């Protein structure tokens, strides 16, 4: 009993240490966003703001110029993220269902090939995509950025949905065919309602990819009015000086939608991420 209690205590301590280590940057970000410029550059930094201020948030939300417009960048990020999520979910759902249910030559190779693409860094696609989008005149456009994001979100979402479809018994579809239901009707009315956790997981994955991505956006988007939030917030860091309070306020505003989405959908997200790993 003493050994078990000791192990539990050690486990709890280790978990607390890991959580503190992981959460510290976020807590420090929130704390800094409420500090004054003098307190940020103080020789003795404080964890809790001595004179909390909302000036950073006010500057971030109300500053409008030819080179800085938070609300416009927010709209661009929402549009790009939602379109990326919609296209990725539609294609990944149909592709995952096809690979899971249909038997064809090269099916196994295709499944592993899709998974292998996630091993390669996204930076390898920048030059080919830049050339292709330049030829198609899609550079500095939202639809071009959405297409770029889909290139690395669709493969993983397809693989994840395929694993989720594998857990749904084929007998359900066979029973529906007895009622003379077509394949598309079976897919829409029988299969899809059972894949809600998987759809939520792929949707959140695609949305976060589009919402947080910086490298592709900074490469393909050149006009200030077409920037997304990660590029816009990064531009707030000057060459000679940086207003860290305002910068951290922007970082908090970017993080909030993702945190809220996770808190609201965490039940479906966890079940969706794990269901495909167990074959029934």
Predicted features by range, described:
Residues 2-280:
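A structural signal for multi-pass alpha-helical bundles of membrane permease subunits
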């Amino acid at each position: 009993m003493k050994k078990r209690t000791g192990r539990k205590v050690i486990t709890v301590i280790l978990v607390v240490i890991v959580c503190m280590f992981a959460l510290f940057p976020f807590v420090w970000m929130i704390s800094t966003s409420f500090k004054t410029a003098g307190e940020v550059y103080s020789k003795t930094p404080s964890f809790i703001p001595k004179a909390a201020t909302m000036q950073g948030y006010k500057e971030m939300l109300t500053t409008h110029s030819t080179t800085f417009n938070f609300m416009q960048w927010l709209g661009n990020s929402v549009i790009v993220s939602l379109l990326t999520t919609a296209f990725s979910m539609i294609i990944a759902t149909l592709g995952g269902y096809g690979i899971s249910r249909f038997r064809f030559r090269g099916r196994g190779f295709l499944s592993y090939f899709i998974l292998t693409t996630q091993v390669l860094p996204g930076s390898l696609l920048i030059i080919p995509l830049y050339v292709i989008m330049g030829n198609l005149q899609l550079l500095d456009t939202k639809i071009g950025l959405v297409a770029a994001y889909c290139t690395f979100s669709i493969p993983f979402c397809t693989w994840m949905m395929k694993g989720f479809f594998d857990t749904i018994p084929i007998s359900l579809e066979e029973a529906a065919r007895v009622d003379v239901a077509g394949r598309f009707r079976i897919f829409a009315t029988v299969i899809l309602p059972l894949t809600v956790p998987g759809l939520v997981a792929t949707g959140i994955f695609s949305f976060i990819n589009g919402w947080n991505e910086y490298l592709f956006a900074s490469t393909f988007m050149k006009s200030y009015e077409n920037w997304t939030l990660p590029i816009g917030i990064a531009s707030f860091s000057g060459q000679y000086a940086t207003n860290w309070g305002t910068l951290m306020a922007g970082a908090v505003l970017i993080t909030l939608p993702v945190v809220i989405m996770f808190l609201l959908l965490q039940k479906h997200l966890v079940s969706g991420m794990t269901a495909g790993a167990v074959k029934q």
